[in-house]
Amino acid sequence: MASRPNILFVLVDQLGARWLPTYGFTLVRAPQLNRFAGESTVFERAITTSPVCTPYRGCLLSGRYPSQTGLLRNGQSYPADHKSLADYLNEAGYETHYVGKWHLSGAPQENRWVPPEKRAGFQHFVGWESHHVDHHAGLIWRDDPHEAIEMPGHETDALTDIAMRQLALAAADANPFFMLLSYQAPHPPCSPPRAFLQQYESRDLLAEPNIDPAAWFRHEDWKANYGVQRFRELYFGEISHLDAAFGRLLRRLDQLDLRENTLVIFTSDHGEMAGAHGLFGKGVMYEEALHVPLIARAPGQSRGRRTRQLAATIDLLPTMLDFAEGESDGMAEGMSLRSQIDGGAPKGERVAISEYQNFCATTQRWKLITRGRTLEPAALYNRVDDPCELRNRLHDPACMTPRRTLSKALQRWREHAVAPNRNESEHQWQQVKI
């Protein structure tokens, strides 16, 4: 392996590990991801640092918590005074490419051009700000706001085609490349091609004990059209379609003779409740929203392995800089996961912190959720004995030790990460559109 590999980072939107066969959910068909996992390192427990799009993306690019970047909700812009992963890799001699959904320019949540000064340092940018209605009829831009590129057919297919062309351009450059490919799928509203939808119609998709078939919907206009069963048919079909596109992308990587010197990482910004606990969407601290897939194939790796190393969003920037032999400005949090990707043992017990409308502290076994953005505990779950999080152990006398331990961890984190002069009431947490 060359010392400085290319890096292909594939980010999908609203795909929880809970819904993938790689993580034990056999109702969904994802053969390409299964094949990729079989030759990669699968992190069994990866936790998003924020279960919402913009805060997550700010964390990914900065290596810092939302409370440190100020990106606490959707519709905010990546701060100009924060260096990004692209900046660090540019300094390390990489060509940096971004393809797909951005959601970091502060513009309204719609399909629009992203100006160069809002691109967080990426040298080559082919993307758009936010949503395309039902994954069809989308537009994507390079540098001219008046020259939009139409994405015919389904957005996932068109975006994959664009990414494969961009890969060929990147491969021709003398410098190593970093490409962040950001899919919007399987973010609802879902409209998978018929062939993928048919795989799930007329099948019972309501197997979990924490499901609520009459679940409350965040989006009022979905109520008339979806029940949990129908939502899952569409959502799972979107996952299978995305899986097929990911397989095409990997085959193109092989055709370009890039496999032996390219680190490939597949992950998601957050999960999807899909009717669990009577909820849809994200923005909460249940496992369906927090637990994301994280699968990494090191350059030249061909044998799969699984690691119990607890991973978090803030680990991704230091991991990629470790492979690239790059340096940050010392402000990034997290730890490099390179040792585990290369087959090393887990580094031991740690606490992963997540934040949005609540704070949450997670270990391999326990999860503590606060009441709003305070340190008042609201729920404590034993993830090993109660994987569907049906029994709140907060007031169980036998669970006082993990409650105290995680409460102290949150207190230390808050003192370190949350700016004391920030007026958080201005964010109106219950009104945020996610």
Model region roles, listed by residue range:
Residues V384:
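Residues forming the ATP-binding cleft of Hanks-type serine/threonine protein kinase domains
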Residues M1-G372, E376-A378, P387-I434:
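Formylglycine-dependent sulfatase
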